[in-house]
């Protein structure tokens, strides 16, 4: 039985907790235990070596303040756990240019999600196209996929060996709370011919004022767990890369944006956002402040979906798109290895400044801008070596 097949029933039970406080970050912990009992517990009777299996799905073991590090590790042979099976850290990123219809997520608020064949065909067309373009990470906008199709995304992620990040339409629990959830699906290979997928769902930390009003107007409530002190973000360590996902209005928090400084190679933001100019200013600053690639995916009618890199302004937008009646997948390769190299050289240059070469020679060798003040060299080396960024003792 696949891990993601067990995840869904555990998730549904967790949406209606007895104490009224949602703890989505504990869903993987419960699923791991159940997965182990059903698939590998019997091996103990035959003294078979399977002690490493539980570690494979130990996805929520390190936390520091508001950051939860999630390591989707893989192992290939001889029962050995491998953190760096994939030596190439560069990634092919795909952003989906699609229109998110307000009628769809409003229907979900009324517990009447639109699960039509037309929507299903369109989503599968997007997934097939991203596979043809050999995407390694596919990003969809906020509120773009019905909550009921989580298992479909997990299945496609596992089969196509492609990470998927998507905002899910609202799901209403028994407490009449409207949950805005962003989902991340991480495919893994834990044996030569055995693959699986680890879904990670996170509740939106900061609902936008207009979003709160819409929920109240539909006679619903925002989750009790929403508060600035309780906010938590995932730091994913997957296939020799580090990234995090922010859900639209979360980017408006300066403190929350700063949590990932030096800790990510790229940052993903899913959006359903009308205020394009404001968010354009935010991500334009973010790409330089965090010195990482930024993948922004908004609904097509508002646009400004793009892939950015920390270079001079004229080159920073690698992909940028708005509009269109039909869905489209736009891909670009982000050179994480080159970025890390530049970060390391930039930090050393700050520490030990030396006379520069001629300007023309410098321009040939430098692609990215220098790192901002206070950029941690230890974090750079940790990412290059594939270690955990957050110490368990923190």
Language-model regions: role of each:
Residues 58-86, 176-262, 282:
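Active-site catalytic loop in hydrolytic enzyme cores
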Residues 1-83, 91, 329:
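Extended repeat-based interaction scaffolds and adjacent low-complexity, acidic/S/T/P-biased segments
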Residues 77-134:
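N-terminal active-site segment of His-dependent metallophosphoesterases
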Residues 136-137, 163, 241-243, 266:
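Structural motif
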């Amino acid at each position: 039985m696949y891990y993601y097949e067990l995840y869904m029933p555990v998730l549904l039970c967790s949406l209606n907790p007895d104490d009224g406080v949602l703890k989505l970050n504990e869903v993987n912990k419960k699923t791991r235990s159940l997965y182990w009992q059903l698939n590998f517990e019997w091996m103990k009777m035959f003294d078979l070596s399977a002690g490493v299996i539980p570690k494979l799905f130990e996805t929520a073991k390190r936390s520091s303040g508001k950051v939860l590090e999630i390591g989707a590790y893989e192992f290939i042979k001889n029962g050995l756990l491998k953190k760096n099976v994939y030596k190439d850290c560069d990634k092919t990123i795909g952003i989906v240019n699609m229109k998110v219809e307000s009628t769809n997520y409003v229907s979900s608020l009324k517990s009447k999600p639109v699960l039509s064949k037309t929507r299903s065909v369109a989503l599968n067309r997007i997934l097939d196209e991203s596979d043809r373009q050999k995407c390694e990470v596919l990003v969809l906008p906020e509120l773009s996929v019905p909550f009921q199709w989580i298992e479909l995304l997990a299945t496609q992620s596992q089969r196509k060996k492609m990470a998927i990040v998507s905002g899910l339409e609202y799901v209403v629990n028994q407490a009449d709370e409207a949950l805005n959830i962003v989902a991340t699906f991480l495919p893994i290979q834990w044996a030569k011919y055995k693959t699986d997928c680890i879904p990670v769902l996170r509740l939106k930390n900061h609902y936008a004022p207009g979003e709160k009003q819409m929920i109240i107007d539909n006679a619903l409530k925002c989750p009790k767990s929403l508060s600035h002190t309780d906010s938590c973000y995932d730091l994913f360590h997957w296939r020799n890369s580090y990234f995090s996902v922010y859900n639209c209005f979360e980017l408006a928090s300066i403190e929350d944006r700063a949590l990932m400084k030096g800790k990510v190679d790229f940052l993903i933001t899913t959006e359903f956002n009308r205020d394009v100019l404001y968010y354009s200013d935010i991500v334009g600053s973010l790409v330089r402040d965090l010195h990482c690639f930024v993948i922004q995916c908004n609904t097509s009618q508002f646009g400004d979906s793009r892939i950015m890199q920390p270079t001079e302004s004229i080159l920073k937008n690698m992909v940028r798109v708005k509009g269109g009646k039909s869905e489209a997948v736009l891909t670009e390769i982000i050179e994480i290895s080159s970025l890390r190299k530049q970060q390391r050289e930039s930090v050393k240059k700050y520490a030990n400044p030396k006379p520069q070469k001629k300007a023309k020679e410098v321009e040939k060798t430098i692609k990215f801008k220098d790192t901002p003040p206070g950029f941690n060299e230890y974090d750079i080396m940790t990412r290059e070596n594939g270690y955990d960024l957050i110490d368990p003792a923190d």
